[in-house]
Each structure stands twice: as structure tokens, then as C-alpha cells.
From Swiss-Prot:
It comes from the Eukaryota. Residues 134-154 are annotated as: Disordered. This is Probable disease resistance protein At1g61310. It comes from Arabidopsis thaliana. Belongs to the disease resistance NB-LRR family. ATP binds at residues 181-188. LRR repeats lie at residues 525-546, 547-568, 571-594, 595-617, 618-640, 641-663. Keywords: ATP-binding, Coiled coil, Leucine-rich repeat, Nucleotide-binding, Plant defense, Repeat. One of its GO terms (biological process) is defense response to other organism. It holds the Pfam family LRR_14. Residues 25-69 form a coiled coil.
Amino acid sequence: MGSCFSFQIAVGDQTMNRIFDCLIGKSYIRTLEKNLRALQREMEDLRATQHEVQNKVAREESRHQQRLEAVQVWLDRVNSIDIECKDLLSVSPVELQKLCLCGLCTKYVCSSYKYGKKVFLLLEEVKILKSEGNFDEVSQPPPRSEVEERPTQPTIGQEEMLEKAWNRLMEDGVGIMGLHGMGGVGKTTLFKKIHNKFAEIGGTFDIVIWIVVSQGAKLSKLQEDIAEKLHLCDDLWKNKNESDKATDIHRVLKGKRFVLMLDDIWEKVDLEAIGIPYPSEVNKCKVAFTTRSREVCGEMGDHKPMQVNCLEPEDAWELFKNKVGDNTLSSDPVIVGLAREVAQKCRGLPLALNVIGETMASKTMVQEWEYAIDVLTRSAAEFSGMENKILPILKYSYDSLGDEHIKSCFLYCALFPEDGQIYTETLIDKLICEGFIGEDQVIKRARNKGYAMLGTLTRANLLTKVGTELANLLTKVSIYHCVMHDVVREMALWIASDFGKQKENFVVQASAGLHEIPEVKDWGAVRRMSLMRNEIEEITCESKCSELTTLFLQSNQLKNLSGEFIRYMQKLVVLDLSDNRDFNELPEQISGLVSLQYLDLSFTRIEQLPVGLKELKKLTFLDLAYTARLCSISGISRLLSLRVLSLLGSKVHGDASVLKELQQLENLQDLAITLSAELISLDQRLAKVISILGIEGFLQKPFDLSFLASMENLSSLWVKNSYFSEIKCRESETDSSYLHINPKIPCFTNLSRLDIVKCHSMKDLTWILFAPNLVVLFIEDSREVGEIINKEKATNLTSITPFLKLERLILCYLPKLESIYWSPLPFPLLLNIDVEECPKLRKLPLNATSAPKVEEFRILMYPPELEWEDEDTKNRFLPEMVSTSTSSKDPLLRNGIPRCLKSESTLLLLILLYLSSCRAFGLYN
């Protein structure tokens, strides 16, 4: 320790007493080493006790308990002591060096004394804290929150949705959450359940504010409702302007962790103008709302809102049973089956299930139930409770549309059958002719506006998008289909008939099993008539429909249409006769339909166009697709207003005179046509308007693709029964083994669908690298195809990543196919890969990161054995594999039925639609 210091002092001197006290009195210096060791040991024990207490607190808080204030004070003191202890121990080596005489003395009396005293006192405090850390209780129930439980009825089928919505709202990164869904679907009930959970968990939030907004609510009313919850609404406050009120609301809420719940909003609520602090991860506040419009969700800042859907069939039946009651259901064995049928009419809509269930609760006679089914089938608006309890509630969604054209578009959709898919492209073309989309003469712009209008209806939950998995294979052009909920459809028909006062305005008996035209009391009152999807064979009656503008007769068994029936239809704008497979002749009285703009004769046996057709000066849309017996369209050049024409799959595609007729149609903007070998040379203007092209019977080797480059609007191409070894663009005639691409040739930017069928000499399709927006690729029965994209031919095109827009890849009966692409591809939008009878294809161009955002990705493959890029890829995609059987040629009729097809009727409908589409595209003979 070094030499000890010496000093001389008289005994009894005051200085000596102080030194003695420093060295011996409290033993701060003499016991310093011992105290330091004890402090380290006791501090370690205290930390262990601290961890035990913290774990107890965490467990209790996970049970929504609140930690005791004494526990928090103790934990804060431990943290403070821990810091102080670390500081003291960090300088202990220096302090120990100051000691001498085996620790009995020190070179620096004052500093060693002070340090020793701090160590001693800290040691005592650590011991005290350690003894105080033995808590019997670390928490207590939280104080009652300012959340008044809202009365709710028991719910059925919403438990999973409630859990998902609650968990999402409680996520740290979620400040704003929207729930959207159609009227009557149960949004408010679900919202109340969420509200009441805040009452269950207690003081996590300082205040939960519930506000019913409703349609047309003003800012001042919202401020007043919120102020009442915050106890601000005195006379002085009421006299302030909106800006000052917002300041007061913001001042109160800024210091609180709040939840604002806005039920039933119809437009964006300006939170800032009201005075609501914007929710963030810092303030941990929440704003939740319900709305019928997905568009409002986006405007409010929730770009991933949660949709509240109708109940599944079994949940709907359970709810309906509860409303009807066991006594009624057990009163007669037959009633249970009838009750199920009534419940099915509600299509899972809780509002309808509740109202109709309550109405039927006292009905114990079988005949009463049979009558209810008849009314709900024939005219649901007449059912008790429908006009005053269901339809007016749904009508709010219609009223909120604002734009009269969009309202008319919505009502027009009611002409289609219940549960029927509405093909968007044909619907929009009809809406254009009806005048609902405006006066734009450019078809593409008008169609885009039509899609925007349907988007508005979809976001308002008045229509539902369907067919994202199968749509591109089931339709000719449509990107998607839409359907209208049955109860919403009844609301539309109710509105269209002036709330039931003029039922003959809209005569809609689609899919009604009719064998003849229904009786109509006043033909002169009929504005629109839909008799599609029935079994009507003849229409021979006379009808004076002088006001009729729309007539749907498609998908019947029509053989004869009397001229007397259409004689007085001078105002008829839309006439759809498609899919009448035995219909072979239009009456000459067609010439009297002077207002006709839309005529669909596709999938009929019509053999020639009537001479009077040329009198239809306003005809804008003419569909003659798949008229296999139509020999001539002579005189069509007289239809000077024609803008859209389809001759796809028609027999006239082999007649060169057709092109001469078409070249005279100066206003033609959209043409679908099938070309045979002798018609490869096209007028430049005509080529530019082709949107759908079928090619059949080409024998060139190789096939020069250059003539297609001028078809700048080509969206769909199918090639059938053609024999060429490759498809190429003209650049060099000397080397036919490579794909020669001329950079000056525009790529096929609009091509979204490609079908290759029975092209037995083709070896690859490398040229599709120049179709960057391809959505569907279908290749079938082409024996020589060995690869989709050839690596050697694409050597100079490595900068192009193929299939970035592809959703559906179907490969069938390709015995030599070994490769799709030589390395993994991202496939950001891919939904399905369907492979059948491609025995040499053992590897798909996938890795673990392919198809990243697709929830319903599916692979149908027979046989299912594959080589994978790596183990991660296998784990990613193997669960999505569906083995297919070899019993069917059709890729949709195999065992790998999509998960979305839950009912036999839906599956049958899709199969029939698909087969129809395959015939339409000429995929099957």
C-alpha cells in the first residue's frame, strides 16, 4: 500500500478527534473493500428481484391489469440505484489504490472518507430496496374507462371478422381503420362489438368516443357531438365559431390517448377541421369508421380497409332459425325445408334474414311458407316488411351516388338475372348506346368511362367484382365480371318501377323458366324488357311497345321472331338476340327500328342479313360473332354510323369481299375478325381498328408477324390450325432459325390474351417477349412446341423480363414441352399455372420470391412431380399444387377445382360458361 504518512499533534486536540472519527468512527475507510464486495453482491440480487417483479408486471398487464403505483416507484428507484452503483464501482480500482496499512489508512483522508461513506450508504439502500421488492401484489384492475357499453344483439358468423378487425385496430402501425360493406350487412353491429371491447380492457385508452355520422352530417354537428363527450358543450362554447371549437377539441384530446369511432360515414370526414389530432405511432390514438363506400376508406387514409361480407350459408341459416324460432320450425316437418329456401333468398344479408325471419316467426302453415317463397321469387318488394324495413335502408346507397348516369347504370344492371354474371364489356357497350356514358364518339374513351362508372358502383358495394380467378378464360375480352346481390337487385327494380307504382316500366323475368312471352297489360308503358335465359321458342304476338328502348332476348331457344312483334318499336335502342342457337332469320320489319344502336346476333344460325338492315342509320354496335352459317354481309357498308363490329368466328371470314365492305365503314373503331390464309393483306386503316384477331389455316414457314405490328389496338389474338415452324418479325430472310426483331417495329403493347391451338409445326413463342402486357397465355395441342421462350433466340433481349402482367398460364397437350423459361421469373400478378399432358416439363420458372402478392395462387399439374429451384421454392409452392386427372381434355373440368367454387350450381355455371367461351374462340370443334 506504500509508506504511511506521519504527523505530530497534541493529544486532545480537536483535529485529532476528526481524524480519529474518519479512520475509526464509522469504519468507512477500514471496511471499504468489504463494502464494495457486498455492494456488488447485493446489487446482483436486487437486479434479479427487479427482473422477477418486471416479469410479474408484464404477465398481469397482458391480462389488462394495471401495475401498482408503489411497484412503479420501486422499479424507478432500482433503476436509479443501479446507475449510481455502476458509477461508484467504475472508480473503485482508483479508490482502492489510495489505501495503505492493509486498508486501515489512506493517503487521501477526505476523498477516501467521502467515497467510503457513499459506498456504505448505497449498500444500505440496496439492502432496503431488496427487502421491499417482495411484493405480494404487483397490479390491480384498471379503473373503469369512460366507455359506455352499447346494446347489441347476439351475432352469428361475425366472430372471425370481429377478431381480425380488433387485432388490426390494435396494431401499433394502424391509426385509421375503415370497415366497408353493403347496407344491412352488419357493419354497425360489428362496430358496436369492437366498441364494447374497449370497455372490457379498461384504461388502455383515456377516452373512447362513439359518433353516429349518417348521411348529410355537417361539421358543426360532429363538433357538437364530440364536445358533449368531452364535457365542453356549455353556452360559451356553443357561441364559438367552428375554428375556435376545433381548437378547444384539439386542446383536450392532444393530451389524451383516445379512440374516435365514426359509424356510417358517407363522405370524407375532415379530422383536422373538427379538431381531432391525427393518429400516429407516437400518440397511439385511433380513428375507426364504417361506411358503405370503399372509396371513402381511401379518402380517409385507410388504403387496406376491411370488407364486411354477407354471411356464409350455414351461418345465414343459423341466424334465420333464431329469428323464426324452434316452435314454428317444428310445427310441421315440411316447414324446415321451406324455411331453408326462404333463407337462401336472402343471400346471407343479415338485414333481410332478420326482417324476413321475424315476419315468418308466427307462420305455422305450410301454405304460408310456400306463398312467401312465391312472393320472394316473383316480386320480392311485395313481401311484408320489404318496402318499409329493407329496401329504404338499401336505397341510401343509391341516393349517395349523386350522378344520374351512374344511377341509371345501376338500375340497368337489374335487367340481368339474379346471381347472374354480368359481362362488363358487353354491359358497357350497351350503356354507351343507351346514352348513360355521355356523348364521347371515341369508343375507347367511352369504354374507359364505363369502367370508371362500374368501379364507382363496386366501391359503393352495389356491385361485386367476381371472376378474378377464371374471368380471363371465360370471356372474350372482359377484364372482370360483376354481380348484383339479389336483395340489392330487388331494390333496383323497386326504384325502377317508381317504388312499385309502375311495375310495367321494367318488365324483368330473366331466368324465369318461361316458354312464351309473358302477359303485359299495357305494352305502351314498357320501357325496358328482359326475358333472357328462358326457353322461349317463338314470338308471334303483336305488341305496340312504342316506348320500349331495351329488349333482352338472349339465351333462349328462339326460332321465330315475328315482324309484328317489333313493328312498333321505333324507340328501341338495344336489341340482344345472341345465343339463340336455332334462330336463323331476322324479319324484314327490322328496318323500322330507326333508333336501334345496338344489335347482337352472335351465336345464332342466321344465314343472311335482311335487306332492311341498311336502313338502321343509327346502328353503332353490331355483333355477328360465331354466326357459323352467315354467308354474306353484303350491304353492311351502308351502316355509316357503325363503330364496333365483331365477325370473329363467323363464316364470312373466308370471303375477300368482306374486307372491301369493311373498308367503307369510315367510323369503324373496333373490329373483331377471323382471317384465313388468303386475307393476310389488310388495309392500313382497317388494321388499326382490329382489337380481336383470329388466324386460321396459315401454312407459311415461318409465319411473318410484321403485318400484325400495324394492329396497334390488338388486345386478343388466337391462332388455330396453322402450320409454321416459328413466328418472326421480318428483318432477314437468310436465317430462319432465330427470331429477328426490328427495333422500328412497335411491340404489342395492347395484347392481353394469346391462344395457340393446333399449331403442330411451331417450336417456340419467343416473340411474346414483345407483348409486355400479356394477361392470359393459352397453348394447346401443338405437338412440336419444346419451349415457350428460346434462350438462344432471346440472347439480345435479356433486358426484357417476360410475363410481368401475366395472370393465367394454361399449357395442355404439349408432348415436347421442356421449358417455359430458363431461369426463375418474378410473376408479380400470376394467379394460376395449369399444366396437363406435358410429360417432359419438369421445372417451372419459379423461386421462393415469385408471385409475392397473390393470396390464391394455384398450380394445377399432371403429373405433379417437379424439380424445384431450391428447398425454399418447394416449401413456398408445393402446398399450392393440385394434381389433375387425365379424364378430361378441359383444364377446368379436372379434379383441381378452385377453392372459390363451393357450390355445385356455381361450378356448373362456370363450366358451361367456359365451354361456351372455348367454342367461341374456336378452341373446340
